[in-house]
Amino acid sequence: MEIRRPSRHGNHPDRTYQRTYKACISCRQRKAKCDLGTGPDGLPLGPPCAKCRREQKPCLFDEKRAWERVKKRGTQSTSNLANSMMRTVVSSGNDALNILFEAANAQSQEDSMIESDSLPETEQHRSGHPVTSEGSSNQIDLTVPPDVLEKAMRPVELSHVSKDVLSTWEACRFVRMGWFTAREAVTFIDLFFKNMSILSPVLTDFYADHKNHRWLIAHDPVLCCTILMISSRYHVLPGVGGQSRNFFIHHRLWQHCQQLVTRLIFGQELSSQPKIRNIGTIEALLLMSDWHPRSLHFPPESDGWDSDLVTIDLESTEYGDDGSNSSAKRWAKDMSEPAKRSDQMSWMLLGSALSLAHELGIYETGDKARDAFVAYERFMTKDQMRLRRQRAQRLLYVYINQLAWRIGCVSLMPQGLSHSILNRQTSRELSQYGEEWLTFMDSWMDLTKLAKSVTDMFFPSVTFARQQLQSGRYIDLLDHFRPLLDKWKERYLQPQLHDKPFYDDIFIEYHFVRVYTHSVGMQAVVERAIADGNADEEEVRPMNIDPIDYEYIQEVIDGCCQILEKVTQLADIGALRFSPVRIFVRITSASIFLMKALSLGARQAKLRESLDVLERTIQALRSNALDDIHLSTRYATLLETHVSRLRRHLVASCKSLKRRRESTTRHSMVPPSYASATSDEHAPLITNPPVPQNMSDMGFTPSLNDIAADDWLSLPFDPSMAPFSISSGGQFPAYEGGGLNFLWNLPS
């Protein structure tokens, strides 16, 4: 006769287990006999034990069994991961980074606890607290492969320069101080315009011409120093000690840039001979927001990170090492903090650039507008100066609004001024100096305006966002924005309209706005899973996906894959290594959106395809590392950790789609040919059918009705493990400073 073990998931989840011998925590620590006494029936009387009664101590028992610790912890971690990952609205670029940071933080803590559980109990309690695994083999390795670093540090070839240009640079103070030679200075400028300026819309190619270097040095000192500073980080000079000189030159140039910015802010310049307060300085500040100095990752030389006027005890400081949380604090210092400093620095630089633009009359008309170009009248035509002014107007609009959207701040650009910039038309006669640039900026400005409208409509407040998700009004709003996105794409996203670098840039920006907009459907699915789930069940699958929400999720998945595939292409041609910071922010955000969408559920073929895209992105980031402290190397490490976990934890689940009667229910259009083609659902397990490059181009999305139960993969979801509640003041934890770092946690 077959004897079946009673299910642990039956009607008695809180069953009490009896042990032959029990000891309180105090007796176990001392390895002493725990005498509870016996009653008339021979059973133990219960706490307190004789020893605790005699010493007047609390007599506490641990109800958990030692062999069960790791398993229960893993189950809870999985539930915490799924719920927090899928419920969290990624409404700014910082939210995605915080997800990555907290997940790595959780892995370090979990690895530490697992190793602690594997040690003998005596070792754990010898010092009164569990032993941590600081420095163990479970720590995530952030080092860059030596071959990648060797490629990044490969010396460049010096430029061929005429004697006249060399004599011009010989008068430069940096050359006279011996930091580098005149020919090396020209090499830095040439390589910046060759490898980096083409990836950013800030500068024209006016200063790329050697004949104009004299004007760059004499009339745009801030811009000149900024170009040299940025280029010196990305390019290593040939000769003995090239790498060491690279660090020295870059650091000295950054120090000089800081001095110039200080003079700008505090007005430390003769008004009769202005060299700092000009349009070139505005362009320099924009470049610094695109490419950061290496010093961003290190504390200031004078006082370190401590700016307090009082001495604080080491244990009370934010990063004081208390043992158990050292891994979390290490991740905060290495990953989250540099990214936040990047946003903070860019925000202040752009604010200074906007203030200087107002001072110079960049947005004025008439005589006031001439103040910005008095210094350039000797060597620039009027049309060139007017074009440079209009470029600055548009660049400031896009850069400020994009960063404000990313970090969740109110834009520094006044509403009236924004409308004025958007309504101004560039003169037809100026197009000869940069028609493709003007087309690119027009498209980017329209897309920025559209993204800002999406944010204002969906996320004016957390309470309002939740109300829209629960009432189904978000569908009407998406029906309003989706045609606008399609119209923008049809008008602007054409390869023949842009240079290749500009097209790649606007391609990534478009698909990110597309992902950002359709992610509202993902959040609606999670809210219904929370509302409809049975709290008594151990696992609640988030399968109450309406067809219209399934369509939105497919848009998110496809948009993310489009971004990451483009990133892989940039890596193949060597452009990713020189890309601005905003590209790496888009990579991080897109990867998080993709993993969130996949966790809700996906077909095996789409899941395999998406995870392969993530793997290629990881390889692209690693193979194009700038140095061992660039954020791309850390992004790659974190992404690899979570992609491998998603592969293990996305399990096959039976489809139990709940047909809702609310107005949110809508049927997607599925051609009969597609339904018949997907009748054999076991085929994707063996082969990968060709997937269209852009599903939205096909005019339909695969229907949920055509997906067999064994072809649907999703992440286990436990709504009872929600890390926050709707009643918590109406604010998402992602906006609460330290509460930003709470998100998902996959077990090892």
From Swiss-Prot:
SMART domains: GAL4. GO terms for molecular function: DNA binding; DNA-binding transcription factor activity, RNA polymerase II-specific; zinc ion binding. Disruption phenotype: Abolishes the expression of all cluster genes. Impairs growth on L-tyrosine as the sole carbon source and affects homogentisic acid and pyomelanin formation. One of its GO terms (cellular component) is nucleus. Residues 24-59 bind DNA. Keywords: DNA-binding, Nucleus, Transcription, Transcription regulation. Residues 108-142, 661-683 are annotated as: Disordered. It is found in: Nucleus. Induction: Expression is induced by L-tyrosine. InterPro entries: AAA_Catabolism_Regulators (IPR052780), Zn2-C6_fun-type_DNA-bd_sf (IPR036864), Zn2Cys6_DnaBD (IPR001138). Transcription factor; part of the L-tyrosine degradation gene cluster that mediates the biosynthesis of the brownish pigment pyomelanin as an alternative melanin. Acts as a transcriptional activator for the genes of the tyrosine degradation cluster. This is Transcription factor hmgR. It comes from Aspergillus fumigatus (strain ATCC MYA-4609 / CBS 101355 / FGSC A1100 / Af293). The gene is hmgR.
